[in-house]
Amino acid sequence: MKRIDPVAQEILRHAFHGVAEEMAVVEYRSSFSPIIREMLDFSCGLFDARGRMIAHSEMIPAQLGLMQFTLAGVLDALGPLAPGDAALANHPYLGGTHLPDLQIFTPVHAGGRLIGYAGSIAHHIDVGGATAGSENAENTELYQEGLIFPPVLLVERGRRNRSLWDLIRANVRDPDATAGDLEAQLSACRRGGERLVELCARHGRATVVGGMEGLLEGTSRRARAEFRSWPRTAVEAEGFLDDDGVTFGRPVRIHARVQVHRGALVVDVSGSSPQVRSSVNVPWASTHAAAYFAVRCFVGAEIPQNDGLTRHVRIVCPEGSILRPAFPAAVSARHLTVQRLSEVLCRALGELLPDRAVASSHVSFPAFVFQAVDPRSGRLALLTDILGGGGGARPGAPGDHAIDSYTSNCALLPAEVAEIEYPFRIERTELVRGSGGAGAQPGGLGLRRDYRLLADAAEGMYYLEQLDRRFGSAGVAGGGPGGPAVVRIRRDGGPWRTIRRGKGYLHLRRGDVVSFAAAGGGGYGAPPRG
């Protein structure tokens, strides 16, 4: 392996990251569904020939680092990909997340030799299953949640697998959008491959391959040094989901014990609840992604995000846990639990490194998918939206308002786009006054949005956390907790009715208004007196 001088290594490091970011721009500009092109629920990455992550676009932290788990499954099943191949996978028990997150990988060859892979993961608006959007917290097994793809070739040596494309189109609710978004992913991967080949032409193939290895080894050294500088004390934290979505009112525990051991960070989540009958179980790869995100928040910015860092994060968890469920447990609403796990881990690391601690951000994650026939076109429309809540306050600054916190980072769907694309009118989008936790620095405010149905009927699932005040966003150093999330509905022009269940299925009629409000963030420091 060719050794690279430090200057060339830094040039290549930033070049790899730039390629991943350019892939994301291509996908953003060519995607069909608003959940990708407006809400930015996708990520792109580069990997070496062994499938190790080299660089990742800065999009969705929940997808941070987990693509290499899926790529490992692809390579185990299919072997090294040939020129012109494109592999597709989404199996949650073979390195995937939940079924709507379709992942595509393409090989990159230079001078006749495999040098790496380009990959894209994107949340598709629908992949079939029992409910619109292929998500429902009340699901009890994976088979209800849509098409399951073990690693399979979507394109083989440049020729499309038409039977597979036809199968996909026949089983999803919006086939044009799904096919268009798959094309966008292929375009992103193609651009990534082109740019890597250009780097080889400019610097030489051996230099680029050596730069990948040097980047990972350099990151690994920095990561070990960082973790060795941390206290060896074991710290613990826990948090709760309001319930699992099936058994109303029974909290679900997420517990973590964190300790540095021999230059690695050991994250023990064995104390968490067993897997549940609903879909808030977390695939093993997503559990790792939550841990990688929390670590990313506490390590120095000079340490890149790649396999050199993540290899030093070790997770302990028995199979059968909510954070390591056994097949075929449902997982479509796994992000609710991933959010809480991320918050718990950040709180634990804040105990370990108090000078870097901040108050907790909301983990309410108000999200829903409604399907309705649009009277303007006669076509089925699938509205997906995710609302931001309050961010945690920190020393010297209040919490941010209306952010999609921790591992999510989706953008808010613009009201104008929602009203053009779907038979809904957005009647209110506003900050919830008083929802931030009290403190010397107050927590951020949650966001409320009201939707009026303009079609004859609509149905769909919704879910959100932190309706239970006991599990509000925690304050730090005397700061108060954030306010709760709220769901309301108003029918036939009558009064607002509060819905107590945070996860469920709604049937709407023309003129109904449904309102979701996210929780606020925790405050930092004791609030001023008087």
Model-inferred region functions:
Residues 1-83, 88-110, 114-530:
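Glycine/proline-enriched, intrinsically flexible loops and inter-domain linkers
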